[in-house]
UniProtKB/Swiss-Prot annotation:
Keyword Secreted attached: yes
GO CC, one annotated term: membrane
Assigned protein family: Belongs to the non-disulfide-bridged peptide (NDBP) superfamily. Medium-length antimicrobial peptide (group 3) family.
Alphabetically ordered keywords of this record: Amidation, Antibiotic, Antimicrobial, Cleavage on pair of basic residues, Cytolysis, Fungicide, Membrane, Secreted, Signal, Target cell membrane, Target membrane
Proline amide PTM sites in chain numbering: 65
Signal peptide bounds: 1-21
Organism from which the protein derives: Heterometrus spinifer
Functional summary from the UniProt entry: Possesses antimicrobial activity against both Gram-negative (MIC=23.8-51.2 uM) and Gram-positive (MIC=11.8-46.5 uM) bacteria, as well as against the fungus C.tropicalis (MIC=48.6 uM). Also possesses a relatively high hemolytic activity. May act by disrupting the integrity of the bacterial cell membrane.
Propeptide: 22-33, 69-74
Lineage of producing organism: Eukaryota, Metazoa, Ecdysozoa, Arthropoda, Chelicerata
UniProt protein name: Antimicrobial peptide HsAp1
Localization terms from the record: Secreted; Target cell membrane
Expression sites (tissue/organ): Expressed by the venom gland.
Length: 74
């Protein structure tokens, strides 16, 4: 693999881990605390990572949410 691809993968991994860490520090509601009490730490961490990855995919698919894609405009 080229160095550029490896560097890109490393940077995306760091970004995902950072965003997951930031999400874990948000204030929890009582419903989230009740839901969390039945799950293990590993399950919660994987859920956070999946949530971050889903948001990144949405961001890359539509970087400007107010604008439609060029293919939709024609």
């Amino acid at each position: 693999m080229s160095r550029r691809v490896i560097l890109t993968l490393v940077l995306v991994t760091i970004l995902v881990k950072t965003m997951a860490g930031m999400e874990s520090k948000k204030v929890e509601t009582t419903d989230e605390i009740k839901k969390r009490s039945g799950t293990s730490e590993k399950e919660r961490e994987s859920g956070r990572l999946l949530g971050v990855v889903k948001r990144l995919i949405v961001c890359f698919r539509s970087p400007f949410p107010g604008r439609r894609a060029i293919s939709e405009q024609t």
